[in-house]
Amino acid sequence: MRVKSVYKKLSVSFILVMLSASQEVNSQAKVSVNLNVKHVVGGISEFDRTKYITIHANQIENEWDGDNFTSDLRDHFLNGFDVYLGRDTGGITWNLNNMQEDASRPGFANPSNIISKGINTRNNYASKTHLHVYENRKSNHVVAAQLHPFWTGESQIATKGTGWELASPTATGEYMGRYFNEFYGGNGEPVPSWIEVINEPAYEALGGKKNFTNSLQEIADFHVEVADAIRVQNPNLKIGGYTAAFPDFETGDFQRWINRDKLFIDVAGEKMDFWSWHLYDFPVIGGKEDIRSGSNVEATFDMHDHYSMLKLGHKKPYVISEYGAQTHDFRNEGWSSYRDWLFVRAQNSLMMSFMERPEDIAMAIPFTIVKAEWGFNTDKNLPYPARLMRKANEPESYTGEWVYTDRVKFYDLWKNVKGTRIDTKSTDLDIQVDAYVDGNKGYLILNNLESEETEITLDVFEKYDSSITNILKRHLTLSSNNVVIEEETFSSSISTVQLGAGSTMILEYTFANSLTIDETSTEEKYYADSYLQPIVASQPILFAVNNVVKSATYGEAVLRLGLGRDHGKSLKPIVKVNNTEVVVPDDWRGYDQADKGRFFGTIEIPVSYDLLTTNNTVSVEFPDSSGHVSSVIMQVFNFSSDIRTLSVNDVTASDTKTLLISPNPVKDGMLNMTIPAKLKNPIASIYNVSGSLLIKQSMKHSQTSIPVNLFDKGVYLLVLQDGSKKIGESKFVIQ
């Protein structure tokens, strides 16, 4: 968690301040990686570039062509950075605006005209064979209808080219179904994977971001009728909505949720194949920051999934068809690298949350357009901000050849990442972490939700001791208000890195041999029997989390507690699982949400795996009233073995792992530890929680005892070294 830190427009000065209560000694976050442990969620364990490394574009767009710095921009960008095509809203809308009305059925598109235009479009595409090679980059493509002229309710607008209005949602759906039948397939473009009924219908119709009283009923009904009409023409299309611009559930003490998103699930949920959202950080809005990244986006997913489980009995996938940052305070300014920084910072932070739920995310598309010349503001002489490309002489003048904006650095950073997801763990919730293994390559991704530089201790464990031949460190950060990727190469293991404020780092490890993955961590979420419960002071709120499967002897669990409360109210309740009180952390992902109307976030509470049973009770009690518990979810990780504890026989001089110590807690003044026989010069050090060194001594092999009877009660850290090389560490408690 970080406290509020306003993004500055002209100069940015980041100060090294460690604020997280969960950080280790010396204010360091620690990241642990098990290279041999596969992390499986919903049967998925691979990094799917087709859903994460995307752009809001189609390969047929003319904007790829022109006076570019490279002769073939499609190839340079899509193939060069291994990027996939995300979304198209233009073709379906342009064609409706120029479609003839059916003379015998006023308000309906002429089927014959749809057929003829479809044939022409397919034949035109078939003739452009240079575009066909990119079909493999749109296997997860999204097509969306724009609000106008598709919307048939209040504020309806006629088609621009032909001047007639659609008669009803059924007329809208019939056109869309016929459009996909005639314009795609055969010698045309591949049929898109995901169809959004309409783009952001509530944005202008229901009072904006802060409104919570207007109802989504008409929009929900529209989705039902359109979906039914599409399926009459083509029952195989995947249809979703409502393409929400601001899924701010907590507004109005959750009245916005009740009047909009809950209502949409109730009315249209059974008709939707997926949910469609737009998720943005607002890092500069009236001199303030309104950030969704971190605990807020976690709570948003958790609440929506929880209610879907209660209402529908299952979750549905999400198409995040736009995401990133809206940079309001820069709207009257030209291009700048700093504005691009605000976007890629949000893009990385949000995508890390998406990657944690691979079974739920069908597609995630940052709102980056190729050139967006259609959005040039002629009144202000300003280009559209959300662009991959810019004129070389911007911002001074809109002249020169087309070159990349600094948004390309996101794609440059991620260009090599692929493989099997492996087990990772961070001691600081503000350090997002993920990792993948592909053959002899390992990719460790670190993202900083803090507004301060953070030192991270790395614990990268390779069970079979395959030696490291190379580490490429790539650090996407801000330097003098410019987005940069700092690169550094190492020929052996590194133990710490400095991660810049709001920055992302990818460490690409190369090993001498292919890595063996022979253990698993299988993740599953279990939802309580109720949600959105009001908070009354000193009154426990009871939840049942049933049918939990513990399929292993070893594992971990996290109680995900969604909270919506006014600022100043407690975020640290008394929580009991099966009548046993658990420790609620003071930290959560991201900042304190001070500029938001209220706090809405997920508090992640570690729960002992041994405490879980098949059917569980959870009690939540606050000292003060108001607000709601929005969701209660038990996140369970079943391990194939004890992956958190290192056997003495597995320790080598290159390992950094949890040590075997006993007893813990220490009650008799003596701490016992096992020293691996392979160590040549074992040294043990004990630190307190402030990072002060209390004792450091050479050790003998075999079972060894360290007297700690002179230490006060509390939490300490034991660190074992072999000479100057750190081998492992363990926390222990003195009672």
Curated annotation (Swiss-Prot):
Catalytic activity of the protein: Endohydrolysis of beta-(1->4)-linkages between beta-D-galactopyranose-6-sulfate and 3,6-anhydro-alpha-L-galactopyranose units in funoran; Hydrolysis of (1->4)-beta-D-galactosidic linkages in agarose, giving the tetramer as the predominant product
Principal EC category: hydrolase
Keywords from the UniProt entry: Carbohydrate metabolism, Glycosidase, Hydrolase, Signal
Signal peptide: 1-27
Variation of activity with pH: Optimum pH is 6.5 with agarose as substrate. Exhibits more than 80% of maximum enzymatic activity at a relatively broad pH range from 6.5 to 10.5.
GO MF annotations, alphabetized: beta-agarase activity
Active site: E200, E322
Alphabetized SUPFAM superfamilies for the sequence: (Trans)glycosidases
Record remark: domains: An accommodation pocket formed by Phe-367, Tyr-280 and Gln-326 at subsite -1 (cleavage subsite) contributes to the methyl-galactose tolerance of Aga86A_Wa. Docking simulations show that the canonical tetrasaccharide of funoran (LA-G6S)2 could adapt to the active cleft, and the G6S could be accommodated by the subsite -1.
Protein name: Funoran endo-beta-hydrolase
Gene (UniProt): aga86A
